[in-house]
Amino acid sequence: MTDSRIDFRRAKFLISAPDIAHLDQYLPGDIGVEIAFAGRSNAGKSSALNALTEQKSLARTSKTPGRTQLINVFQLDDDRRLVDLPGYGFAQVPLALKHKWQEALGEYLQKRACLSGVVVLMDIRHPLKDLDMQMIEWAVLSNIPVLALLTKSDKLTQSVKMKTVNDVRAALKEFGDKVQVETLSSLKGTGKPKVLSILNDWCHPEWLAEQKAEQASASELAPE
């Protein structure tokens, strides 16, 4: 664990990409660090992002799940970004469009070199649906750490919450330490310190220091 803390409250909107199938055209260069947030359309992803950054409207919430399919990128500092991926699995979205999103999401996970971690958000009352498992498996196969984040934890009693957490951890045991399971209540803030600690560690991968050293060396060698 690193002692260098990232202030997630400093997150600010950077750019939106209208089509996930052409994500590379809109995202910044494949350098630095990105942490992706993915989840079903009713998983409370926007509320979680707002709670973690202590900003009420950083990520726009919608009363109609699946309505907004923009990819929103938020900048933490010059080297680090949060990527809010479109919600998946909403019933009213045409099947062909669902398939396109899933294909593009899989490609993003497999090819984005600066991706340091993926947060897969799930309503704690309905965890580990098929698409959730697919996202987790894609990330693990791409050697990307995963945080399986059970949202809306205030909806359950403490005993039921802990049983659900234990059940989910048991179901994901095959992935070993590549997948962590935690809970979050965006409403009450419970679970937030642990989640931020994990995200902070992801913001400091070993390859970031190597990348910055290479950039500095190239800059020194460049003709004036």
Swiss-Prot record:
Belongs to the TRAFAC class TrmE-Era-EngA-EngB-Septin-like GTPase superfamily. EngB GTPase family. InterPro entries: G_ENGB_dom, GTP-bd, GTP-bd_ribosome_bio_YsxC, P-loop_NTPase. HAMAP family: GTPase_EngB. GTP binds at residues 39-46, 66-70, 84-87, 151-154, 184-186. Keywords: Cell cycle, Cell division, GTP-binding, Magnesium, Metal-binding, Nucleotide-binding, Septation. Necessary for normal cell division and for the maintenance of normal septation. Residues 31-205 form the EngB-type G domain. GO terms for cellular component: cytosol. GO terms for molecular function: GTP binding; metal ion binding. Pfam families: MMR_HSR1. CDD domains: YihA_EngB (cd01876). Its cofactor is Mg(2+). Mg(2+) binds at residues 46, 68. It comes from the Bacteria. This is Probable GTP-binding protein EngB. GO terms for biological process: division septum assembly. The gene is engB.
